[in-house]
C-alpha cells in the first residue's frame, strides 16, 4: 500500500510538473534539458564551434539542448551545427541530428577506445571544450555502497576530462548530496582551478541531486 501511494504521488507530481509540460511543448525528451539550460545560461558553457561530449546521454535531452545551441550559431550552415557532439550511454538512444552516438558501457576498454577514436576524429586533435555527465549509478539504498558507486562514476568522468579537455575546458557532472559528496568536491578541487556547485530550479527540491562544475585544468594533459 505504501509503495502504491508513493507511485501515485510521484505520478501526480510528474504530470503536473511545469518542466515536464515545457519539455513536451518544446520537443525535449526529458525535463533534464532545463537543468542544463539554466546552468548554461548562468555559466555560459556552450559556445559556437565547440566539441562537446555527453556522458550518460540517454534519453538525449542534454544532447538535444546542446545541438539546438550549436545550430543557432550564425556560422551554422545548410542545417548543420557549428561544432561537434559525441554522446554515449549504456542504454539505447533514438538518433539526434548531428549527434554521434555510441551505445556501450563507458567502463569497458573497447567502448572507451571507440569513444576516444571518435573524439579524436571530430576534434581534429583529440581535445574537447566541454564534458557533460548526467551518469548516475543504480542506487541500492545502502548509503555507503551508493556513495562509492557515485564517487566511482565521478572519477571516470574526471579521468576522461583530464585526458581530453582543453586547458580552458569545463566538466559538469551530476552527483548527490550526502555521503561521499565532499570527496567528489575535493577531487574536483585537485584538478580544476574553478569549482562551483549548481542546483538548478528544474532539479526537484526534494531530491539530493546537485551538479558540480569544474573549469580550467590545473594540470593540462
From Swiss-Prot:
Which regions form coiled coils? none
Q: Which residues bind S-adenosyl-L-methionine?
A: 60, 62, 89, 105, 134
Q: What class of enzyme is it?
A: transferase
The secretion signal range is none
The record's subcellular locations are: Cytoplasm
Under which EC number(s) is this enzyme classified? Answer: 2.1.1.166
Biological function:
Specifically methylates the uridine in position 2552 of 23S rRNA at the 2'-O position of the ribose in the fully assembled 50S ribosomal subunit.
Write down what this protein is called. Answer: Ribosomal RNA large subunit methyltransferase E
* Organism annotation: Ralstonia pickettii (strain 12J)
Amino acid at each position: 500500500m505504501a509503495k502504491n501511494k508513493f507511485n501515485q504521488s510521484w505520478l501526480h507530481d510528474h504530470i503536473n510538473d511545469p518542466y515536464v509540460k515545457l519539455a513536451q511543448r518544446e520537443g525535449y525528451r526529458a525535463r533534464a534539458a532545463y537543468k542544463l539550460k539554466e546552468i548554461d545560461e548562468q555559466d555560459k558553457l556552450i559556445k559556437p564551434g565547440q566539441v562537446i561530449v555527453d556522458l550518460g546521454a540517454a534519453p538525449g535531452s542534454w544532447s538535444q539542448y546542446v545541438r539546438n545551441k550549436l545550430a543557432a550559431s550564425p556560422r551554422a550552415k545548410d542545417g548543420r551545427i557549428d561544432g561537434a557532439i559525441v554522446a554515449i550511454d549504456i542504454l539505447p538512444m533514438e538518433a539526434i541530428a548531428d549527434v554521434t552516438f555510441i551505445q556501450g558501457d563507458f567502463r569497458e576498454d573497447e567502448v572507451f577506445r571507440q569513444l576516444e577514436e571518435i573524439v579524436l576524429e571530430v576534434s581534429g586533435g583529440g581535445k574537447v571544450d566541454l564534458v557533460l555527465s548526467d551518469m548516475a549509478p543504480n542506487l541500492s539504498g545502502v548509503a555507503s555502497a551508493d556513495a562509492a558507486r557515485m564517487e566511482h562514476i565521478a572519477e571516470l568522468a574526471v579521468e576522461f576530462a583530464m585526458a581530453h579537455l582543453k586547458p580552458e575546458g569545463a566538466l559538469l557532472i551530476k552527483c548527490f548530496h550526502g555521503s561521499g559528496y565532499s570527496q567528489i568536491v575535493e577531487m574536483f578541487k585537485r584538478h580544476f582551478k574553478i569549482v562551483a556547485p549548481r542546483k538548478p530550479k528544474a532539479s526537484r527540491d526534494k531530491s539530493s541531486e546537485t551538479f558540480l562544475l569544474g573549469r580550467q585544468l590545473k594540470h593540462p594533459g
